[in-house]
Structures are given as C-alpha cells and as structure tokens.
Amino acid sequence: SYLGGQQVAGPSAISERFRGADSTWLSVVPAVEPLSGEGEGEARLRLLGEPLEARYRGTTLTLLLPGVSEALLERARRVAEGVYLARDLVNEPPNLLTPEALAERALELRALGVEVEVLDEKAIAELGMGAFLAVAQGSENPPRFIRLRYAPEGAKARLDLVGKGLTFDSGGYSLKPTESMATMKSDMAGAAAVLGAFKAAALLGLPVELRGYIAACENLVSGRAYRVGDVLKTLSGKTVEVMNTDAEGRLTLADALAYAEREGAERILELSTL
C-alpha cells in the first residue's frame, strides 16, 4: 500500500546516510501506489527520505527514478521543500528559534510572493490580545504575531491556517517535569506546518488563497509570568480564569482564532501540539 511504502522509504534513506559513503546511487523501482498514477507519490517519498543534516554531511545522493517524468519529480520536490522547512523549524533549539527568529523565517517567504507582516508587542497590545500577551509576559524574548497571505490571481477558494507558535513551553508556574519539557522546543510545530504549507503552496502555484496567523511566544517562569487565578481578557471580549498555566496553547490560539474570524475567515484549519 502507499502507507506501507511511506513507512519503508523513510527508514531506509535514514539508515543509508550513516554509512559514511561520499556518494550514494539509489535506484527506485515502483514499489508503492503513486498519488498521481504516474510516479509522483514514489518520488515524493524518496525526496522526503533525504536526510535533514545533508547540508552538514557533504554526502551526494543521486536518485534514479524510472518512469517518473521531470514535471512530476519537480512537483514532488516542491512539496518536499515545504516539509523540509517545517522539519528544520521543529528541530531548531529554543535558544536559537525565539519568537523573533521564527518571525524572521516567516519573512523569508516574501521571496516567493507570500505577503508577510510581523506585529511587535506594542501592536499586539493595541489589538487587544490579552490572553496571548499574558502567556508571553514571563519571557525576556518578546512575542510576535505573524500574518501571512498567499493570494494568486484567479484563486478559487480561501482557507485560513492558524498555527500554535510556542517556541518553548516550560509549563509556566504549572511547571512541567523535565522529561515532558525535553520536547517542548517543538511546541511550535503547528506554526512550522503553517509556514511549510505556505512555502509549498507558493512553489506549486496552487489556485487557492491562503491566510495564516501565528501567535509566537515562550511560556516561562519569572516574576512577570502569569499565574493560576489570573483573569484575562481575550480579543473576542470574553474573559478566561487561568486554572493551569500549562494550558497556554488554548490562550494563544483563542486570540489567533478570534483574529482570523475578524478577518473574515469561513474555513479555518488549526494546527497545534496540545
């Protein structure tokens, strides 16, 4: 099945990269059902199996894909580029991928024709995003609200994407245990998926309008951090009493979703690690 091929392709490519070869030739024979019926699925699987650390290892991987046209291979490559972006962001250490750094990565999409605007802490406060700001206030790294728009001429539909953007989540005063905190550099995976989707859509020239919203911040412990028992006012005008500071994603997303609704969203895809 296609899923079976997907499960096999990744590990085989991953194991290959640790064998120390200067170059590798990989001949791909049809082994899975392609998405398009012409080999695109096969090509995409092999492309996604490419090691993330290839830029550090200097290994050359040559793919031999019989029966796959250049056009289909190029389409698969463009999809994979979006996945690579999301993967790289999720794996960045939190001392490097701060909210501001995530915003800078989003701004790079302007080169592909994506409209990107980044709001600082003052602008966020002026909007009235009290829940988002409460989560962010415990960190020395200021929050950023990221707005994206991909609107090709003749777009046939609109989809709004909202991604959770916690670049690190300690749990706040409802502190996580160490073993649970170890993966919290990836609590911005929803935001990474949004940015990856915009990159892939722009590269593919998809005939759909996309709008994206990311509330990027950190949830840390400090003398300024929000507390259990605090009452917060959200962008929608509703108030929330905090009973657990480790439920921060619901607060940041509440403001981001309310903003999407204010911008006229009718179909929203929300992406988060909760």
Describe these PLM feature segments:
Residues 87, 103, 107, 145-146, ...:
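Predominant activation on well-ordered alpha-helical scaffold segments within soluble catalytic domains
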Residues 206-274:
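A glycine- and small/hydrophobic-rich beta-loop-beta segment
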